[in-house]
């Protein structure tokens, strides 16, 4: 029972961190679409239900597995929606009120390699300049007009995400 509670607590902590990261970036820095807002709400709602059900799973076995499924599916949908949001949303209608230094870069093609999938090409207006100015602690390797870019080593991806998230939260707190 003790190990189950520890595992549930770790799962909730990791899930909450992922949901916070997925929701905070487009909410504070981009225009959020209604569809994406609904997915974010479902992620947080399922996450809030997941914590008590993990603790009392011996009496709420079915409800526990139901909320876990809802939480995982909503989180996956949110991640997919985030990817589509960054790749398919028109560049002209993106507003970044906290980052006015972004400039038009027509050839900023970024390739992110995933462990279990082929490289995914993501185009974003000013993405190179954004990361170079906001992530000084990480050396980025860009190759414009290339179909494959070594953006970051796979084993440093969680550290990279954590540092970028903390930096954005710090900048946001200073601007409020």
UniProtKB/Swiss-Prot annotation:
Alphabetical UniProt keywords: Membrane, Transmembrane, Transmembrane helix
A GO term from the CC aspect: membrane
Protein's membrane topology: Multi-pass membrane protein
Domain of life of the organism encoding this protein: Eukaryota
Residue ranges of the TM segments: 3-23, 27-47, 79-99, 107-127
Subcellular location: Membrane
Name used for this protein in its record: Uncharacterized protein C56F8.15
Organism: Schizosaccharomyces pombe (strain 972 / ATCC 24843)
């Amino acid at each position: 029972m003790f190990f189950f509670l520890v595992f549930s607590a770790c799962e909730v902590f990791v899930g909450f961190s992922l949901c916070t990261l997925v929701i905070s970036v487009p909410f504070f820095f981009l225009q959020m679409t209604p569809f994406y807002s609904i997915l974010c709400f479902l992620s947080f709602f399922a996450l809030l239900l997941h914590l008590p059900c993990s603790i009392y799973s011996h009496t709420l076995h079915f409800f526990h597995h139901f909320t876990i499924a809802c939480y995982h599916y909503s989180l996956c949908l949110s991640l997919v929606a985030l990817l589509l949001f960054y790749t398919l949303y028109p560049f002209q209608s993106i507003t970044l009120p906290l980052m006015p230094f972004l400039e038009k870069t027509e050839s900023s093609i970024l390739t992110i390699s995933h462990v279990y999938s082929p490289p995914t090409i993501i185009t974003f207006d000013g993405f190179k300049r954004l990361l170079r100015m906001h992530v000084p602690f990480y050396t980025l390797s860009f190759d414009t007009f290339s179909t494959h870019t070594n953006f970051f080593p796979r084993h440093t991806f969680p550290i990279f995400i954590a540092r970028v998230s903390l930096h954005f939260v710090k900048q946001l707190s200073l601007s409020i």
